[in-house]
């Protein structure tokens, strides 16, 4: 009976997930993980919880209307990252660890894009200081992502609009050095 109960909780979480009821899926998965923390399928439960936290589904319709992760709720992305990180930390040899690691990389890039999109939003509304601050967050927290080059360019544009031409010139120099460094063999 215990084994059937375990399977029932886990399987109901999957059904909720496939039925686009992420909150119920997460609730069932939390219940499963609390009741059976050392269960052989705990890695799967964590992986499914991470996907449900992002409210992602695999399937034809969801792939056709898939929204960019960076346009979704930033807190949900951070929460999902933490779930995937727990999976990789607790179960590094799990069959789900490579997928969780890939999702973590996607989420870091999405967070960087989210910050950059916010900076662009402020720039378009001529809130140059706010745009500059958001672009600095990208450089500080996500400097190893492909988004950092765009953040530097936006910073240079902000400095120009603020008539801080020395800072703009410095930023353009950094961009040139960064670009040269990246393109050298």
Q: Which positions does each model-derived feature cover?
A:
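Single conserved hydrophobic/aromatic residue that forms the stacking wall/gate
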Residues: 1-5, 9, 181-185
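Short coil/linker segments at helix-helix boundaries
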Residues: 18-28, 34-35, 53-83, 122
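TPR/TPR-like (Sel1-like) alpha-helical repeat modules
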Residues: 78-91, 159-179
């Amino acid at each position: 009976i215990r084994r059937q109960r375990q399977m029932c909780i886990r399987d109901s979480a999957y059904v909720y997930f496939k039925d686009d009821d992420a909150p119920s899926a997460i609730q069932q998965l939390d219940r499963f993980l609390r009741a059976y923390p050392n269960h052989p399928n705990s890695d799967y439960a964590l992986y499914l919880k991470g996907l449900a936290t992002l409210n992602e589904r695999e399937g034809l319709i969801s792939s056709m209307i898939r929204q960019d992760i960076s346009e979704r709720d930033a807190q949900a992305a951070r929460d999902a990252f933490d779930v995937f990180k727990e999976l990789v930390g607790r179960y590094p040899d799990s069959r789900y660890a490579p997928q969780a690691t890939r999702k973590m990389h996607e989420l870091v890039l999405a967070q960087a894009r989210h910050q950059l999109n916010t900076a662009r939003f402020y720039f378009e509304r001529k809130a140059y200081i706010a745009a500059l601050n958001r672009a600095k967050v990208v450089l500080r927290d996500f400097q190893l992502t492909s988004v950092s080059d765009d953040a530097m360019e936006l910073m240079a544009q902000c400095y120009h609009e603020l008539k801080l031409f020395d800072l703009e010139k410095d930023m353009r120099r950094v961009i040139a050095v960064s670009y040269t460094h990246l393109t050298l063999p």
